[in-house]
């Protein structure tokens, strides 16, 4: 493959940036990896096979892309910063199995790209070092659009990874935990110190693996309503589940109907949202869906 030295070293990274006169944009959360051991752990954590396809988001100068291209059948990478396209074309020129797309992945036609770039029936995984500022929107788009990914392995802010994988009753548990775990099994894999990036971010990162479920974690009457219910339940963590639902879901006039739904779901109205499991939220969502519709 590539006869050049690996991209993810301090010397090579600096040489690439200097060669192309590239300056980092803070607004795009650009932090480049300079540790090959961490890259190896990301690739290992993702668990893809050599015949699989990879979607990468935010390839930067190609450090992770290069390692993915060595082991996967094909890598399709979305880069929002047009200044990086010629850099990537240079650093990844030895890898014919890499396709760079200049696009914001949040606005891209992902189904169309997957159909065009990968073989029918080919297993596809997402592997990415995501910018902190756009982590949640990207992850939720990938999950909510129900694209045919087997897994999503991402390096993200450690605190966000903990929130996504959190269990009921923990201080990290919240709406993001339920939203992500509804679609996927979440497992933190590797803690990554800030020192392996150029420039160094202010916080540590974590590699998180989301293994997509064949069917959602819980079954509900109305999925959008379910999401509305648990989001409302976490609006104010100091309030009880009853107060949060009254103030953030249906209004004071619906208090009696909400109390009835809580009773039907077997949930104490004095509990707080962070103590409810996804299964309890599913029961509550269905009960609220029925009682509030009757009250209308």
UniProtKB/Swiss-Prot annotation:
The keyword rRNA processing applies. It is found in: Cytoplasm. Keywords: Cytoplasm, Methyltransferase, RNA-binding, rRNA processing, S-adenosyl-L-methionine, Transferase. Transmembrane segments: none annotated. The keyword rRNA processing applies. Its EC number is 2.1.1.182. It catalyses: adenosine(1518)/adenosine(1519) in 16S rRNA + 4 S-adenosyl-L-methionine = N(6)-dimethyladenosine(1518)/N(6)-dimethyladenosine(1519) in 16S rRNA + 4 S-adenosyl-L-homocysteine + 4 H(+). Its main location: cytoplasm. Pfam families: RrnaAD. It comes from the Bacteria. S-adenosyl-L-methionine binds at residues 31, 33, 58, 79, 104, 129. InterPro entries: KsgA/Erm, rRNA_Ade_diMease-like_C, rRNA_Ade_Mease_Trfase_CS, rRNA_Ade_methylase_Trfase_N, rRNA_adenine_dimethylase, SAM-dependent_MTases_sf. One of its GO terms (molecular function) is 16S rRNA (adenine(1518)-N(6)/adenine(1519)-N(6))-dimethyltransferase activity. One of its GO terms (cellular component) is cytosol. PROSITE patterns: RRNA_A_DIMETH, SAM_RNA_A_N6_MT. Specifically dimethylates two adjacent adenosines (A1518 and A1519) in the loop of a conserved hairpin near the 3'-end of 16S rRNA in the 30S particle. May play a critical role in biogenesis of 30S subunits. Belongs to the class I-like SAM-binding methyltransferase superfamily. rRNA adenine N(6)-methyltransferase family. RsmA subfamily. This is Ribosomal RNA small subunit methyltransferase A. It comes from Shouchella clausii (strain KSM-K16).
